[in-house]
Structure formats: structure tokens, C-alpha cells
């Protein structure tokens, strides 16, 4: 090694090391961004599925409970299952619209940055 024990490190070697490290960091960041985008889309897909299923479940629960109270066995359950489905679809479509708006804003910001 070119440095003495307890001496200062060689500035040229440090600069070369920093340059190599920065190049390695740049090559590692590119795949990570693509993976983050895929994860974000998968998260949104699961969110939409959960919204739809929870709407159905809540509608079923309300309908079943009201049927048990009033003794109108399948009637209110069917009505509230369809209402829950409609509510779940409405919330799911709103989430899809928000995602579309966010992607449009990101695309517009990307074009302005270039």
C-alpha cells in the first residue's frame, strides 16, 4: 500500500473509489425503480379487490341481519348483496380513476422535466 500507518490516504485513490461507487449505485437503482412500479400496481389491484369483496361482505351482513330480525329470509339479503356489490364497484372505479389521474400527472411531470 502507498500510505503509511497513521498517514493520510491518497486523494487520487479515494477519488477513483468514489467514482466507482457512484457508478455502481446508478446501475443498482434502475431495476429497483421498475420493481417499485410493479409493486405499486399490484398493491392497487389488491386494494380494488378488497374494496369489492368488502362491499359484498358488508351488504351480505346487513341483509342477513335484517332478514333475521324481520323474518324475510332471502329477500333483504339479496337486495343488500346487490347494493353492496354496487357500492364496491363504485369505490373500485373511484380508485381506478385516482390511479389514472396520478399516472397522467406523473407522465406530464416526466415530459416537463425533459
UniProtKB/Swiss-Prot annotation:
GO cellular component: plasma membrane-derived chromatophore membrane; proton-transporting ATP synthase complex
Membrane-crossing segments per the record: 48-68, 69-89
Example GO biological process: proton transmembrane transport
InterPro entries membership: Atp1_alphaprobac, ATPase_put
UniProt subcellular location: Cellular chromatophore membrane
Pfam families, A to Z: ATPase_gene1
Membrane association type: Multi-pass membrane protein
Oligomer and partners: F-type ATPases have 2 components, CF(1) - the catalytic core - and CF(0) - the membrane proton channel. CF(1) has five subunits: alpha(3), beta(3), gamma(1), delta(1), epsilon(1). CF(0) has four main subunits: a, b, b' and c.
Protein name, per record: ATP synthase protein I
Gene symbol of the encoding locus: atpI
Amino acid at each position: 500500500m502507498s500510505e503509511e500507518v497513521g498517514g493520510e490516504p491518497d486523494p487520487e485513490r479515494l477519488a477513483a473509489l468514489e467514482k466507482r461507487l457512484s457508478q455502481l449505485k446508478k446501475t443498482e437503482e434502475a431495476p429497483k425503480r421498475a420493481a417499485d412500479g410493479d409493486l405499486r400496481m399490484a398493491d392497487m389491484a389488491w386494494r380494488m379487490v378488497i374494496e369489492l369483496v368488502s362491499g359484498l361482505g358488508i351488504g351480505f351482513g346487513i341483509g342477513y341481519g335484517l332478514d333475521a330480525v324481520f323474518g324475510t329470509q332471502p329477500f333483504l339479503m339479496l337486495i343488500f348483496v346487490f347494493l353492496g356489490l354496487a357500492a364496491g364497484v363504485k369505490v373500485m372505479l373511484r380508485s381506478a380513476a385516482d390511479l389514472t389521474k396520478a399516472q397522467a400527472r406523473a407522465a406530464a411531470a416526466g415530459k416537463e422535466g425533459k
